[in-house]
């Protein structure tokens, strides 16, 4: 079905709005120049996590650190293969982490609301916007325990900390034990640096530190937001425990390891889904009779979602041409629309 749709699309005349006028001296040459080789190639989905490893992580289901290591080993292999949609994977996990953080802070903002917020005009303000920025910064930059980075995250949570002193403590923790245990200790250090009255905000800071230290220890080029996506899972809590473990609690190391075991499995599932979707997008891209199409493909592979207006800013095309291009991709099953609205639509893998 997709091949037939592609052949049909290839026979359609190009949309005049999709064209970018070329200088007179280059127009004739442009007609005869060979097509460029696609920048991205299709990529096999990562190996699925075994059923025995997927069952781990829950309270009372064996050693959570063992299951965390198994999941991280597979996720590490998947990331080191450098899949085309690695950016979209990190961006989507950052969105999930922001939504989970909003629940911890009792902020009314789910994934859909956060997606809309990310495309709001101007500089969005408020707790939800700050949470989204914290996790996007975490996933979008090389992992670092630089005091300035720590201070910026703390400021967005309205926390008064000593960034230099905290950075020194975190670096000391980061070199200890195995990667997951080191990240758990660093999270405890970050959490303990804040007065008890701001425990919820301190936990968000601690979770971002956890993922940063984990990335440093695993030598990932960018952190992959993991722990917040599963920390609220009720199966991590032992029966009769009363409340969810927080950094510094005796049950925290096991809860953190269990959350990572579950998060790594879910991240691998998401990576496999994005690999299949990105392969469809990459296969469709050469058939699109639009010069800026490759830039749109790049945006979709690097982000959770893209608006036509944003696409038009990054590619030499009008907003109407961008909407038409996304409609074509949607028709061919190469992208999805996330908002469900007739206007102000958002597209992604």
Please provide the spans of the model-predicted regions:
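N-terminal structured helix/loop subdomain that forms the ligand-binding/catalytic interface
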Residues: 1-190
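Short, cationic-aromatic polyanion-contact patches
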Residues: 282, 286-290, 337-349
């Amino acid at each position: 079905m997709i091949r037939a749709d592609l052949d049909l699309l290839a026979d359609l005349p190009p949309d005049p709005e999709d064209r970018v006028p070329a200088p007179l001296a280059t127009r004739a040459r442009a007609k005869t120049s060979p097509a460029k080789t696609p920048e991205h190639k299709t990529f096999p989905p990562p190996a699925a996590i075994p059923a025995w490893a997927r069952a781990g992580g829950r309270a009372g289901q064996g050693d959570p650190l063992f299951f965390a290591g198994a999941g991280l080993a597979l996720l590490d292999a998947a990331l080191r293969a450098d899949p085309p949609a690695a950016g979209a994977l990190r961006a989507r996990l950052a969105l999930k982490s922001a939504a989970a953080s909003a629940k911890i802070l009792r902020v009314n903002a789910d994934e859909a609301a956060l997606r809309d917020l990310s495309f709001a005009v101007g500089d969005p303000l408020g707790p939800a916007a700050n949470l989204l920025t914290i996790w996007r910064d975490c996933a979008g930059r090389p992992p670092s325990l630089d005091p300035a980075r720590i201070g910026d995250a703390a400021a967005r949570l309205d926390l008064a900390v000593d960034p230099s002193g905290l950075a020194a403590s975190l670096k000391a923790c980061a070199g200890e034990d195995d990667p997951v245990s080191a990240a758990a200790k660093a999270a405890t250090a970050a959490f303990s640096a804040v007065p008890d009255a701001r425990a919820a905000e301190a936990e968000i800071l601690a979770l971002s530190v956890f993922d940063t230290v984990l990335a440093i220890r695993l030598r990932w080029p960018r952190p992959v937001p993991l722990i917040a996506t599963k920390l609220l899972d009720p199966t991590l809590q032992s029966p009769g425990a009363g409340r969810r473990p927080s950094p510094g609690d005796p049950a925290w190391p096991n809860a953190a390891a269990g959350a990572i075991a579950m998060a790594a499995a879910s991240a691998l599932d998401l990576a496999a889904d994005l690999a299949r979707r990105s392969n469809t997008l990459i296969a469709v891209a050469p058939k699109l009779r639009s010069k800026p199409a490759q830039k749109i493909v790049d945006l979709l592979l690097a982000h959770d979602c893209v608006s036509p207006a944003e696409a038009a800013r990054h590619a030499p095309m009008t907003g109407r041409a961008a909407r038409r291009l996304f409609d074509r991709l949607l028709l061919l099953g190469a992208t999805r629309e996330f908002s469900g609205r007739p206007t102000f639509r958002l597209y992604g893998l």
